[in-house]
Amino acid sequence: METWQEVTVHVHRDAQEAVSHVLIETGSQGVAIADSADYIGQKDRFGELYPDVEQSDMIAITAYYPSSTNLADVIATINEQLAELASFGLQVGQVTVDSQELAEEDWADNWKKYYEPARITHDLTIVPSWTDYDASAGEKVIKLDPGMAFGTGTHPTTKMSLFALEQILRGGETVIDVGTGSGVLSIASSLLGAKTIYAYDLDDVAVRVAQENIDLNQGTDNIHVAAGDLLKGVSQEADVIVANILADILVLLTDDAYRLVKKEGYLILSGIISEKLDMVLEAAFSAGFFLETHMIQGEWNALVFKKTDDISGVIGG
């Protein structure tokens, strides 16, 4: 029986996305995230009851490596990369690293124990595909089986993207989802009434996973997934373009986004740590967009821009 090595890194939740990327880059076959915040604060907003969980700013990110991996070298590299992230201003927190061996059948499903149904916005709830869930009246359920290499839809950057889509979409829109990952934003767009959604990702694995997740959800035949490098070569105009990726990548798509967004349409940009906020704002303003909404959760920012001639109540351009 093949065994796997499990490495758990305890960091501040604001570093979740960056640290997950570090773990994948060091050879992990996937990551699982345990965050008490996924269960805290939902009761007051939506009236549901959740288990009592002690809230902490720290989260546990567990990575899985083949048994042949030199774990000492991997852990040394992880510590070096985390120190570098901290030097860039990202709030990493007090880092601790644990490791253990894991049998293959445990590795295959171990990450699932951290993944529970989560009410993300007023209308949208993300539910693991293997979970039976009774939706309440008006509740829109997104079924996901992201695998270990993709987020479960509960990261602040995803939450803010979903909230923005819920506020903007009224039915009949064309949406472009750049860097679709698990496909969660495309699925949400369909459930919120968008007529047609085009989802792009540079990663072939993401394209496959997104399509598999789309197939889990009824009424999502209007989502078209394809490999693509941001918006290069795209000619389809859209009412809404949404991208939840790193800030350094977001600044590369603002000009193409302005070309493709229809008049009075929207550009939603998320995945922006506070230190990179001005850089993204400058790129979007230079492209011609006006800022309509700025959302903040911890160190993360999401921005909603509009392509308009009516500049009352908006900033930039």
Curated annotation (Swiss-Prot):
EC number: 2.1.1.-
Location(s), subcellular: Cytoplasm
Taxonomic superkingdom: Bacteria
The keyword Cytoplasm is annotated on this UniProt entry: yes
Keywords: Cytoplasm, Methyltransferase, S-adenosyl-L-methionine, Transferase
Cysteine disulfide partners in this protein: none
Coiled coil segments of this chain: none
GO biological process: methylation
Record's keyword annotation contains S-adenosyl-L-methionine: yes
Reactions it catalyzes: L-lysyl-[protein] + 3 S-adenosyl-L-methionine = N(6),N(6),N(6)-trimethyl-L-lysyl-[protein] + 3 S-adenosyl-L-homocysteine + 3 H(+)
GO molecular function: protein-lysine N-methyltransferase activity
PANTHER family per UniProt: ELECTRON TRANSFER FLAVOPROTEIN BETA SUBUNIT LYSINE METHYLTRANSFERASE
NCBIfam families referenced in this protein's UniProt entry, alphabetically: prmA
Family: Belongs to the methyltransferase superfamily. PrmA family.
Name this polypeptide is given: Ribosomal protein L11 methyltransferase
